[in-house]
């Protein structure tokens, strides 16, 4: 049975048909709008194999989001530096993802824990069409070091299986999207475990899907490689989604091609 390669297929599509566009960083891109990838999470964990993805950074970043944190100090203590380019001298990033997920401010001065609210709905009203978590808080964007690229996500339950769809307004296909796919697939596994559900699909929807001009050669190298089977995720039991640690996330049989370095557009 052939290995599904929706991510690599999108890379090819953008290389072949993407429109040349300028961008905020001044780097230049090839871009397509409104693309979608689908992964059956019961068939394997969607960690890209055509280049090595740094799983440690994926896991610690997600745990950092779930902590409601927005300072890179905790990431640094665990050897993760992926947010350093945007952090202030004190390590602060403003009210980014984790703050919005766990402590969305209300006009009355209270705060909403969107992750806990989503879990409550999954347990009590799994057919709800309102199981959504948003990081796109328009009133707080000016205070964020970087406006959310992966802006909001929705959960959907059918036949005891939990699926998640992410909307990513801005998608750096070579560097960012492999991280995002793995991160939200892992989050879906965690939410499913906490709600007593099996995993269904992870659906990634991208707005501006782009390859930076200085990533084109790296993308061509990646696409020259033969994809390998996806690994298996084993997640330890925890009583709360906020109790997971790095050691609770084990990936078996990950056999990727070597990593490919590329500059980050800041």
Curated annotation (Swiss-Prot):
GO annotation, biological process: dTMP biosynthetic process; dTTP biosynthetic process; methylation
Gene Ontology cellular component annotations, sorted alphabetically: cytosol
Reaction catalysis annotation: dUMP + (6R)-5,10-methylene-5,6,7,8-tetrahydrofolate = 7,8-dihydrofolate + dTMP
Name of the protein: Thymidylate synthase
Subunit structure: Homodimer.
Keywords: Cytoplasm, Methyltransferase, Nucleotide biosynthesis, Transferase
Binding site for dUMP: 24, 129-130, 169-172, 180, 210-212
Active site: 149 (nucleophile)
Family annotation (Gene3D superfamilies): Thymidylate synthase/dCMP hydroxymethylase domain (3.30.572.10)
Domain of life: Bacteria
Function summary: Catalyzes the reductive methylation of 2'-deoxyuridine-5'-monophosphate (dUMP) to 2'-deoxythymidine-5'-monophosphate (dTMP) while utilizing 5,10-methylenetetrahydrofolate (mTHF) as the methyl donor and reductant in the reaction, yielding dihydrofolate (DHF) as a by-product. This enzymatic reaction provides an intracellular de novo source of dTMP, an essential precursor for DNA biosynthesis.
Cross-referenced SUPFAM superfamilies: Thymidylate synthase/dCMP hydroxymethylase
Database matches in Pfam families: Thymidylat_synt (PF00303)
Sequence similarity: Belongs to the thymidylate synthase family. Bacterial-type ThyA subfamily.
EC number: 2.1.1.45
An MF annotation (GO) of this entry: thymidylate synthase activity
Location(s), subcellular: Cytoplasm
Coiled coil: none
Pathway annotation: Pyrimidine metabolism; dTTP biosynthesis
Organism name: Mycobacterium avium (strain 104)
Binding site for (6R)-5,10-methylene-5,6,7,8-tetrahydrofolate: 54, 172, 265
């Amino acid at each position: 049975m052939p290995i599904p390669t929706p991510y690599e297929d999108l890379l090819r599509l953008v290389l072949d048909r993407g429109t040349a566009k300028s961008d905020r960083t001044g780097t230049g891109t090839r871009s397509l709008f409104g693309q979608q990838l689908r992964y059956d999470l019961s068939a394997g964990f969607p960690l890209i194999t055509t280049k090595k993805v740094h799983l440690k950074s994926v896991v610690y970043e997600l745990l950092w989001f779930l902590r409601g944190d927005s300072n890179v100090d905790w990431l640094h203590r665990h050897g993760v530096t992926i947010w350093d380019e945007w952090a202030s001298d004190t390590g602060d990033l403003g009210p980014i993802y984790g703050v919005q997920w766990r402590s969305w401010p209300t006009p009355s001065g209270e705060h909403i824990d969107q992750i806990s609210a989503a879990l409550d709905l999954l347990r009590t009203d799994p057919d709800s069409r309102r199981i959504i978590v948003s990081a796109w808080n328009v009133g707080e964007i000016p205070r964020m070091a970087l406006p959310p690229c992966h802006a909001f996500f929705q959960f959907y339950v059918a036949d005891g299986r939990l699926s998640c769809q992410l909307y990513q307004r801005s998608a750096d296909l070579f560097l960012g999207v492999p991280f995002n796919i793995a991160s939200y697939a892992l989050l879906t596994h965690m939410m499913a475990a906490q709600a007593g559900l099996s995993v269904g699909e992870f659906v990634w929807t991208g707005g501006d899907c782009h390859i930076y001009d200085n990533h084109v050669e790296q993308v061509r190298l990646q696409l020259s490689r033969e994809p390998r089977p996806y690994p298996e995720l084993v997640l330890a039991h925890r009583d709360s989604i906020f109790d997971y640690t790095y050691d609770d996330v084990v990936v078996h049989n990950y056999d990727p091609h070597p990593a490919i370095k590329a500059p980050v557009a800041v």
